[in-house]
UniProtKB/Swiss-Prot annotation:
Annotated effect of mutating R241L: In PAH deficiency; severe
Name recorded for this polypeptide: Phenylalanine-4-hydroxylase
Organism: Homo sapiens
Gene symbol of the encoding locus: PAH
Substitution effect: R270K: In PAH deficiency; severe
Lineage of the species this protein comes from: Eukaryota, Metazoa, Chordata, Craniata, Vertebrata
Phenotype when changing E330D: In PAH deficiency; severe
Length: 452
């Protein structure tokens, strides 16, 4: 038998919302103090009656209960119950009895919101719909210093792009856009200028994939690629996919998408009055900066590792992971032979900074995540400092080691077959993982034998 305690989950939620997990969730949309309890029992006569009797003896009032066959163990049933908030004082004793007398495995979210609470995180790729529209800035609204603030045509256009993102749901094809001539002109200026630097300044992986994007995705000076075409291409390369977004997401939400190999991508383009400047990510930054390297297996895995590390992490570690992301995925340099090349999207989409970062002006340091994670950075001018990775694989291992220091009571892995995050917090989940690894090792050994 196993149980999980959740606080403030929202009384409208059903057992089916929780999938097959023992769930670590704090749902911030309900603050009424109610408690929900998930537990599983072996399918035998009187099993549920024992638990209900335990509740009665401890003056616990059930306001809702539902059941279903367990998705983890065929001989068990799962029960989802709502407990009256007045039952809170008895909860500690109930959990103690479940653990010691009934042999339950209990996972509890703290009832003290000031400490130890695990933040909510998406468990299925469909749950990205929950926060994709919770943007922090821009979208259809522009600040007064934005180049397009006084342009009514540009503002109306931005609203069109925002509406596309707001109405999008996972599984739908990304709507195609008929870009205007002025938008194509802006793209062409950026594309032509940056492409002239890629062979000498961009990393090998970037230059390897860029011709394929030209061939299969319409990366041309006179054409703005469609996100749906690019997303389909990415999925065939690394399993990454694009999802339209209206503006900037919080660090937690954005990194959470990477855990599912989903990149939240803007569809609008910068204002034509300043083609070489944008105060926000736009389609030039996304497609010319990010997309080529999301097509590389090693870099895609590295990016996903950052996302997985963010799931359920405390706020202070989200800030550290966001800083690591900034100095790697956005503004990273790497060694290649005797040279140093750029792989960060912020560099590969900025003509001026791409030249500057490989000059003698900035300071270069080796990538050490303990130091990188707390390094201050600027968002209004070129970076005075860049971190140099030995390789994508080296950076990936460093992220894994850093993730091991994050204080959370579980580990996670992504299941690409079900597109779910598996929380590894019980022996059943570990057995499933071990079986999967054993199967992969068997394939590896068989292949090695045939190669010999």
């Amino acid at each position: 038998m196993s149980t999980a305690v959740l606080e403030n989950p929202g009384l409208g939620r059903k057992l089916s919302d929780f999938g097959q997990e023992t769930s670590y969730i704090e749902d911030n949309c309900n603050q009424n103090g109610a408690i929900s309890l998930i537990f599983s029992l072996k399918e035998e006569v009187g099993a549920l009656a024992k638990v209900l009797r335990l509740f009665e003896e401890n003056d616990v009032n059930l306001t809702h209960i539902e059941s279903r066959p367990s998705r983890l163990k065929k001989d068990e049933y799962e029960f989802f119950t709502h407990l009256d908030k007045r039952s809170l004082p008895a909860l500690t004793n109930i959990i103690k009895i479940l653990r010691h007398d009934i042999g339950a495995t209990v996972h509890e979210l703290s009832r003290d919101k000031k400490k130890d609470t695990v933040p909510w995180f998406p468990r299925t790729i469909q749950e990205l719909d929950r926060f994709a529209n919770q943007i922090l800035s821009y979208g259809a609204e522009l600040d007064a210093d934005h180049p397009g603030f006084k342009d009514p045509v540009y503002r109306a256009r931005r609203k069109q792009f925002a509406d596309i993102a707001y109405n999008y749901r996972h599984g739908q094809p990304i709507p195609r856009v008929e870009y205007m001539e002025e938008e194509k002109k802006t793209w062409g200026t950026v594309f032509k200028t940056l492409k002239s630097l890629y062979k000498t300044h961009a990393c090998y992986e970037y230059n390897h994939i860029f011709p394929l994007l030209e061939k299969y995705c319409g990366f041309h000076e006179d054409n703005i690629p469609q996100l749906e075409d690019v997303s389909q291409f990415l999925q065939t390369c690394t399993g990454f996919r694009l999802r339209p977004v209206a503006g900037l997401l919080s660090s937690r939400d954005f990194l959470g998408g990477l855990a599912f190999r989903v990149f939240h991508c803007t569809q609008y383009i910068r204002h034509g009055s300043k083609p070489m400047y944008t105060p926000e990510p736009d389609i030039c930054h996304e497609l010319l900066g990010h997309v080529p390297l999301f097509s590389d297996r090693s870099f895609a895995q590295f990016s996903q590792e950052i996302g997985l590390a963010s799931l359920g992490a405390p706020d202070e570690y989200i800030e550290k992971l966001a800083t690591i992301y900034w100095f790697t995925v956005e503004f990273g340099l790497c060694k290649q032979g005797d040279s140093i090349k750029a792989y960060g999207a912020g560099l590969l989409s900025s003509f001026g900074e791409l030249q500057y970062c490989l000059s003698e002006k900035p300071k270069l340091l080796p990538l050490e995540l303990e130091k990188t994670a707390i390094q201050n950075y600027t968002v209004t001018e070129f970076q005075p400092l860049y971190y140099v990775a030995e390789s994508f694989n080296d950076a990936k291992e460093k992220v894994r080691n850093f993730a091991a220091t994050i204080p959370r009571p579980f580990s996670v892995r992504y299941d690409p077959y079900t597109q779910r995050i598996e929380v590894l917090d019980n022996t059943q989940q570990l057995k499933i993982l071990a079986d999967s690894i054993n199967s992969e090792i068997g394939i590896l050994c068989s292949a090695l034998q045939k190669i010999k």
